[in-house]
From Swiss-Prot:
Catalyzes the attachment of serine to tRNA(Ser). Is also able to aminoacylate tRNA(Sec) with serine, to form the misacylated tRNA L-seryl-tRNA(Sec), which will be further converted into selenocysteinyl-tRNA(Sec). It comes from the Archaea. One of its GO terms (molecular function) is serine-tRNA ligase activity. It is an enzyme of class 6 (ligase). Signal peptide: none annotated. GO terms for cellular component: cytoplasm. This is Serine--tRNA ligase. Homodimer. The tRNA molecule binds across the dimer. HAMAP family: Ser_tRNA_synth_type1. It comes from Pyrococcus furiosus (strain ATCC 43587 / DSM 3638 / JCM 8422 / Vc1). Its EC number is 6.1.1.11. The lineage of its organism: Archaea, Methanobacteriati, Methanobacteriota, Thermococci, Thermococcales. It catalyses: tRNA(Ser) + L-serine + ATP = L-seryl-tRNA(Ser) + AMP + diphosphate + H(+); tRNA(Sec) + L-serine + ATP = L-seryl-tRNA(Sec) + AMP + diphosphate + H(+). It holds the Pfam family Seryl_tRNA_N. ATP binds at residues 283-285, 299, 370-373.
Length: 455
């Protein structure tokens, strides 16, 4: 939600930002907001004038009564004023609703460093890490995707896709999950279950070491939390509703964490508030028909460890960089080659002022795929959820800035581990950082196993 004062004081900035985002149909909204706002302020001014006049009449009525003079004319006039005030208050309320309709549907103002573009093809890679394993048939494409800025090892044998590795390793059952729940669901089995849990504890431990408070949030939230955290379009495309209840299954722990301090004034000395949450996530994935229909990359249900920060406005951009660095460190420990991408205006979404994605190299697929998103939402969520802070009790509260970043979405991290650490025979080596959590150092194909999860 945007600050109405920003639109009053700098409407051209807002219009230009909408143009950069490709939201051309909303540019006319700004003039309409200004027109409604001017009318709203005029009516408020008239209400205040009438209240002042009514107070003067009340004083005059008191004087006349004391003097034994008639007051009927003044009482009639006061009654008319009260009636007019009531009418104006209704008009003001209606104008406020119309203004809020637009304010609640406008995207955040982008940071100047966000590249202008139409879609994901215009996102800008800003750094690369690791030594990629590249099948010779993918080499030309890899060199283009990595801009020649990444070390690589050419493989003569073709790496398998994660969905095929899961079958070879006995790690998932998609057919029975489809029977029970439909498409984009899965049963995880055997060592992959332990790997999923290991990734959760690994990410939690690393972030707790950095001062984050661990949280398991509610897995369902009320509508006001979702409305405050995301866009209305997500209610159709992403979020599952519980029938007959004012409850929604969370698509990410970001949302219950954003709602955690709704309608609160925080003590400035407590900022920043650093949270790391574990939760399952539930997503409709509407509008993704035909994309990643096999495997566990794009699914309706998955586990995720999420970073979330409540920050002072002047510190939020520093925290944005720190959050993405935290996630990078996790993937470096997992020995997953990746690139960090600055997301362009057309792919940014409404909530974030700036977003970085970490995209892991997937040798089986021969391309980089998103595994982390890190966003600075500035005060967009805080205004909708009314989250403020102050340093002194006599100080006017200010809105906090909220930031979020994936630490690890386990299903996508598993995809990256399987594809990057596979051997030619289908065995998958477990990254050293996870050994103490898994209790085993590799996963071997089913035909070579003597039992699950052997060291």
């Amino acid at each position: 939600m945007l600050d109405i004062n920003l639109i009053r004081n700098n409407p051209e900035l807002v219009k230009n930002d909408l143009k950069k985002r490709g939201e051309l149909d909303k540019i006319a909204w700004i003039d309409e907001i200004l027109r409604l706002d001017e009318e709203w302020r005029k009516k408020l001014k008239e209400i205040n004038r009438l209240r002042h006049e009514r107070n003067k009449i009340a004083i005059e009525i008191g004087k006349r009564k004391k003097a034994g003079e008639p007051v009927e004319d003044l009482l009639a006039k006061s009654k008319e004023i009260v009636k007019r005030i009531e009418e104006l208050e209704k008009e003001v309320e209606e104008l406020r609703k119309r203004i809020d309709y637009y304010l609640w549907r406008l995207p955040n103002i982008t940071h100047p460093s966000v590249p202008v573009g139409k879609d994901e093809n215009d996102n800008v890679p800003i750094r690369f890490w690791g030594k990629a394993k590249v099948w010779k048939g993918h080499l030309e494409s890899f060199l283009e995707q990595s801009q020649g800025k990444m070390e690589y090892e050419v493989l003569e044998w073709r790496p398998k896709l994660h969905v095929d590795l899961l079958e070879i390793l006995g790690g998932a059952d998609f057919a029975r999950a489809a029977k029970v729940s439909g498409s984009r669901f899965y049963y995880l089995l055997n060592e992959i279950v332990i790997l999923d849990l290991a990734l959760i504890r690994f990410a939690l431990d690393r972030l707790i070491e950095k001062g984050f408070t661990p949280v398991i949030p509610p897995y369902m939230v009320r509508r006001f939390v979702e409305e405050g955290s995301t866009t209305f379009e997500d209610f159709e495309d992403v979020i599952y509703k519980v029938e007959g209840e004012d409850l929604y299954l969370i698509p990410t722990a970001e949302h219950p964490l954003a709602g955690m301090h709704a309608n609160e004034i925080l003590d400035g000395k407590d900022l920043p508030l650093l949270y790391v949450a574990f939760s399952p996530c539930f997503r409709k994935e509407a509008g993704t028909a035909g994309k990643d229909t096999k495997g566990i990359f794009r699914v309706h249900q998955f586990h995720k460890v999420e970073q979330f920060v409540y920050s002072r406005p002047e510190e939020s951009w520093e925290w944005h960089e720190r959050l993405v660095r935290n996630a990078e460190e996790l993937f470096q420990e997992l020995e997953i080659p990746y690139r960090v991408v600055n997301i362009c205006t057309g792919d940014l979404g409404y909530v974030a002022a700036k977003k970085y994605d970490i995209e892991a190299w997937m040798p089986g697929q021969g391309r980089f795929r998103e595994v982390v998103s890190a966003s600075n939402c500035t005060d967009w969520q805080a205004r909708r959820l009314n989250i403020r802070f102050r340093d002194r009790t006599d100080e006017k509260p200010r809105y906090v800035h909220t930031l979020n970043s994936t630490a690890i979405a386990t299903s996508r991290a598993i995809v990256a581990i399987l594809e990057n650490h596979q051997q030619e025979d289908g065995t998958v080596k477990i990254p050293r950082a996870l050994w103490k959590y898994t209790g085993f150092k590799e996963i071997v194909p089913v035909e070579k196993k003597e039992g699950c999860c052997k060291a």
